[in-house]
């Protein structure tokens, strides 16, 4: 533990001087509905020697690593990685288990990590472990022994990258992982980032004499003008578009950041990793000022339990969201984003709010349109309020965060763990990451966004498109607003209330009143799983 804290402290010190002075999961789209398990080919690469002499495991013993992933996102690349790795290490089979969709994946995590974990995979989407087992708290997933802490692994040599594991990443990105995971552990290493942007059809906007929106007021006015011009759905949106509400919530709540940070005297306090929290006050002139602060989930839950969702703050936030959300299509929150994308590509909707993990597909689709159906298009960030409402900051920060969050399931089998870590290092090397991206794109699969591993770049056109998703990153305030905050049992109710609200069938007061029970049910489940006593100064024990 002392060594781990020393490593984290050194990392934090290297980052803070430059980054803080200079600046303050997800719902994914899947196209298959069945679950499949696939194994890569084990043929040897011509002219390559097996790497066995310096292996940290028993090369005379066969073993299997299982990589469990959600369909379509990097799956082609991951299969290629497995195939090439087995050419180097034929004693280790790598199985790529492809699960059909998000819900099936969460169910798999719950069943496979229950009890003795005999059927548990080895490398998983760590954020989905958090969603399934600890109500989005990845730090607690480490505490409970589900996920392996990679802190010490950062100092290990990566034989596939010519240096230490940490050398593949910027200090800033490693520190962000630490901050987002609760300030104590490294449950994953960064691979890529995702963001959200407004896609626009320039030809249709010009025809309707509408400027490209860049402010919140611009977006409101654009939707109003397009509606008047005859577009039934001026802005196409799918379930991921809830992030637009999160942007509005951040502009309001970030002034309260100091109230929900881990603080000196809290049981979780660690001076070496949380110094950014001390005496913190949000600086509106510096939108990056809070990026290395560490939120206290227990303080969040305490606030949520004491204040509920029917607050004046949330009324203001949802009132603002409604000014654009009322132009969303019917049933947007529960619909498949494929329809929203098709409406934009088919020029039914001039605007689309969408994530970078669909950007490559949209770019390819539009490039493939016949000449008589093609159109000029681009992406834009809605970066500010032109005239901020009372209580809101002027800068609108978007979602810009790590996308493919891959974690290792913890195990006491040292030989097996050494193999898992070695494959992970192979993947998170420059050559491995390039292979994963290139194979994925060549097979028509999605990539989530730009790669953060040093030395990995994409096709120039795709890089230029993805650059439009970069924004000052907002902190996550869904816990305060209730947006996407429901148990599985209550999710249909949440969808119904949200659709009634954005379609104008119920008022904001009625929406919040209806959501109060849904909100508290989720909070109570989160508190129970985490073992919180709602006193941050006392240590808690997460329930098994």
Region spans (language model):
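C-terminal capping/gating helix-and-loop segments adjacent to ligand/active sites or protein-protein/ligand interfaces
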Residues: 70, 440, 450, 463-529
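Short, well-ordered beta-strand elements
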Residues: 60-72, 92-98, 123, 187, ...
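Extracytoplasmic "Venus flytrap"/periplasmic binding protein-like
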Residues: 84-172, 203-214, 350-351, 368-372, ...
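Periplasmic-binding protein-like
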Residues: 77, 424-450
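Hinge/lid segment of periplasmic solute-binding proteins
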Residues: 44-54, 131-195, 211, 264-287, ...
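Extracytoplasmic/periplasmic substrate-binding proteins
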Residues: 76-83, 131, 138, 254, ...
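Glycine-centered hinge/linker elements that transmit conformational signals in sensory
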Residues: 223-225, 262-334
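Short, low-complexity disordered leader/linker segments with a strong preference
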Residues: 1-66, 87, 527-544
């Amino acid at each position: 533990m002392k060594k781990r804290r020393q490593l984290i402290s050194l990392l934090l010190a290297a980052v803070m001087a430059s980054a803080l002075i200079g600046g303050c999961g997800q719902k994914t789209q899947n196209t298959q509905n069945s679950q499949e398990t696939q194994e890569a080919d084990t043929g040897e690469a011509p002219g390559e020697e097996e790497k066995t002499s310096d292996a940290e495991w028993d090369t005379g013993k066969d073993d299997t690593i299982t990589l469990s992933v959600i369909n379509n996102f990097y799956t082609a690349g991951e299969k290629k990685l497995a195939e090439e790795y087995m050419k180097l290490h034929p004693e280790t089979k790598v199985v790529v288990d492809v699960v059909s969709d998000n819900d099936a994946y969460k169910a798999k995590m719950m069943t496979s990590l229950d009890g003795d974990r005999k059927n548990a995979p080895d490398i998983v989407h760590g954020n989905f472990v958090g969603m399934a087992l600890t109500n989005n708290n990845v730090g607690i997933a480490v505490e409970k022994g589900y996920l392996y802490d990679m802190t010490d692994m950062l100092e290990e040599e990566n034989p596939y990258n010519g240096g230490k594991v940490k050398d593949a990443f910027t200090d800033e990105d490693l520190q962000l992982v630490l901050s987002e995971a609760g300030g104590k552990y490294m449950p994953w290493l960064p691979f890529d980032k995702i963001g959200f942007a407004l896609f626009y059809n320039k030809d249709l906007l010009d025809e309707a004499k509408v400027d490209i929106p860049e402010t919140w007021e611009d977006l409101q006015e654009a939707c109003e003008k397009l509606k008047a011009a005859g577009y039934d759905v001026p802005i196409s949106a799918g379930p991921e578009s809830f992030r637009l509400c999160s942007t509005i919530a951040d502009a309001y709540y970030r002034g309260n950041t100091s109230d929900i940070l881990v603080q000196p005297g809290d049981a979780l306090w660690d001076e070496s990793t949380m110094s950014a929290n001390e005496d913190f006050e949000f600086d509106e002139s510096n939108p990056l000022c809070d990026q290395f602060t560490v939120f206290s989930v227990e303080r969040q839950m305490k606030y949520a339990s004491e204040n509920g969702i029917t607050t004046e703050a949330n009324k203001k936030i949802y009132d603002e969201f409604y000014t654009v959300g009322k132009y969303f299509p019917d049933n947007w929150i529960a619909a498949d984003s494929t329809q929203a994308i098709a409406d934009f590509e088919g020029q039914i909707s001039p605007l689309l709010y969408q994530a970078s993990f669909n950007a490559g597909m949209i770019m390819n689709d539009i490039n493939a349109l016949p000449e008589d159906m093609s159109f000029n298009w681009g992406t834009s960030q809605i970066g500010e309020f032109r005239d901020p409402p009372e209580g809101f900051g002027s800068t609108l920060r978007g979602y810009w965060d790590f996308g493919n969050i891959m974690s290792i399931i913890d195990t006491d089998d040292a030989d097996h763990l050494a193999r898992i870590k070695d494959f992970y290092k192979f993947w998170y090397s420059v050559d491995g990451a390039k292979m994963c991206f290139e194979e994925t794109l060549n097979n028509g699969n999605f990539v989530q966004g730009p790669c953060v591993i040093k030395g990995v770049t994409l096709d120039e056109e795709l890089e230029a498109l993805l650059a439009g998703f970069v924004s000052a990153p907002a902190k996550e305030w869904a816990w305060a607003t209730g947006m996407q905050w429901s148990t599985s049992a209550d999710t249909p109710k949440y969808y119904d209330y949200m659709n009634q609200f954005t379609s104008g069938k119920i008022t904001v007061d009625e929406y919040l009143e209806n959501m109060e029970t849904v909100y508290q049910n989720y909070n109570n489940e989160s508190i129970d799983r985490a073992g919180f006593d709602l006193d941050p100064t006392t240590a808690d024990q997460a329930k098994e």
